[in-house]
Amino acid sequence: MPEQSNDYRVAVFGAGGVGKSSLVLRFVKGTFRESYIPTVEDTYRQVISCDKSICTLQITDTTGSHQFPAMQRLSISKGHAFILVYSITSRQSLEELKPIYEQICEIKGDVESIPIMLVGNKCDESPSREVQSSEAEALARTWKCAFMETSAKLNHNVKELFQELLNLEKRRTVSLQIDGKKSKQQKRKEKLKGKCVIM
């Protein structure tokens, strides 16, 4: 499927095994797989309506490996929004996001206007937690981005993650409708602009 100029591109970054693919597959297809299959790069698409026209939410699930720096740079340069995923059971996976965030800043410039979510996945594995949510929240404040904990396995906060990411978009109105209900924030944005809804 050729890329359209009005595609809304979201890139998902994080170390290998943190659950990037699991989050994306849970959101797009509603499925979860127990086995770990390393990703080189996959793209998933979801049709959304945006300001009364159709556009595509294009989600790029990037590799957790450091072997493909050119692909990583390309995903950043083409991306409109970013999801930075670590596992709450691995401090190392949080540390590995720092150079990725720095690269986003370097390529994109003013990151305050770009939707970025810091995501602590695997919150269903709390007994093995290495990263406290308060610590990740503090990092998100430093990075001026939003923060959320998720569980792809339990489908906890998965749709909400993508909704919140789209709510951060200030340049146009894009949103998911969760069970047909709109948040007050969405209603307020829709009064100000057109509206975007996942079909």
Swiss-Prot record:
GO MF annotations, alphabetized = GDP binding; GTP binding; GTPase activity
Positions of post-translational Phosphoserine modification: S35, S126
Its record classes its membrane topology as: Lipid-anchor
Q: Which residues bind GTP?
A: 14-21, 33-39, 61-65, 121-124, 152-153
Q: What is its main location?
A: membrane
The reaction(s) this protein catalyses: GTP + H2O = GDP + phosphate + H(+)
Is-annotated flag, keyword Ribonucleoprotein? no
- Propeptide boundaries: 197-199
Q: What InterPro entries does this protein's entry cite?
A: P-loop_NTPase, Small_GTP-bd, Small_GTPase, Small_GTPase_Ras-type
A Pfam family found in this protein is Ras
Top enzyme class: hydrolase
User: Which tissues does it occur in?
Assistant: Highly expressed in brain.
Q: How is it modified after translation?
A: Ubiquitinated by the ECS(ASB11) complex via 'Lys-11'-linked ubiquitin chains, leading to its degradation by the proteasome.
Q: What EC number(s) are associated with this protein in UniProt?
A: 3.6.5.-
Where does the record say this protein resides?
Cell membrane
| Keyword line | Cell membrane, GTP-binding, Hydrolase, Lipoprotein, Membrane, Methylation, Nucleotide-binding, Phosphoprotein, Prenylation, Ubl conjugation
The Gene Ontology biological process annotation of the record reads: signal transduction
Q: Which residues carry this modification: Cysteine methyl ester?
A: C196
User: What does the similarity note say?
Assistant: Belongs to the small GTPase superfamily. Di-Ras family.
Q: What functional role does this protein have?
A: Displays low GTPase activity and exists predominantly in the GTP-bound form.
Q: Could you tell me which NCBIfam families the record lists for this protein?
A: small_GTP
Specify the protein name.
GTP-binding protein Di-Ras2
Q: What are the top taxonomic ranks of the organism?
A: Eukaryota, Metazoa, Chordata, Craniata, Vertebrata
